[in-house]
């Protein structure tokens, strides 16, 4: 894929700092000045790297200019220009399954029990980083505390290893409060409703404050943004936007600006020389949104098992990471936990996670860490579970469908058995082995309740009616 960075860098020509904002676009400062009573701690420029993981909500690859999209994303584009862009990174098709997979490094068939829920006792990358001596923080969206329908309470941020938290949807799915205007947020577990203000600005302030307060020690910041998830709203920079497309466009631009604010804070604090930043998305773009990518109209695939449902941006930036590189290596969300462990020199996690460390690939020491990705997708009540395995260009579904994928247009073309020859035959055989070697037994039907008239997960058990007649927040 050709380089796409010149327009983005030109848009930032008025600023010399990483992630800086041209004066004509700058908005009022959102952080109060620090008290002058005591000198600020000095930033670390050596030792274990700080690590920041930014997770945009409902954001596929077509949303980034550096990936061929047509949105205004100069700050994320600059991350790609100054770091490594991964062109074959994949999340689960929906937010809760993705977050469970991302945080625990395990396949969903092992520990995904219900939408908006992660069971207490699960070990997350927050625990891993805290065990490594890092100060850990999370700012943004949680959605793991419980679904509000079956009475179970999910894992807390504290139990997941986070020293500090500032979160939307910490509580059960209903009621959850606003993520945008007049936001509801819980600071270290204490909820507060604000009558005014834009939620993403509240989150950004907390993220920047966390960075500044902990600049003298290694920190891990997980920043699962609420942008660009629907509802489509006007942002402080797009107050005249009307209609879903225009408002979504403004939300993408605002998300990018907040990334720029974070990068500017790293530069201002002298932390850009010892901080690794990873930017990605939790699943494909909402299906109401159609975007252009390299001349192709790409409909969002959130919730679908097609490539548009799983294909997300993945950009790594920081010391020791090749600049301006585009990698074809496959990246899966199970890989993040072992990657962070590898980055911080922790012991191998063999047998405890399904992912593999991508650190050698990110650091430019290896070309690939895996040859295929497996997914078990059972997101919520009324969905029949699906299993599929894929590499960069081919996908095999558990029901036998074999497709060729175009990762740019997002089109999947079924390949009949009679046409599975040569390269297609080789990939079919390899993916068939992945499916055969991965979990294929019945799951506990109590974990995935089905409604009357739907097949049970376990054919040997009767269908249940748990959760029927309710909408478990599938758009979250």
Where does each model-flagged region fall?
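Bacterial N-terminal signal peptides
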Residues: 8-20
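Positively charged n-region of N-terminal signal peptides that target proteins for export
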Residues: 1-4
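Formylglycine-dependent sulfatase
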Residues: 27-400, 405-433, 440-476
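Sec/Tat signal peptide C-region and signal peptidase I cleavage site
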Residues: 21-25
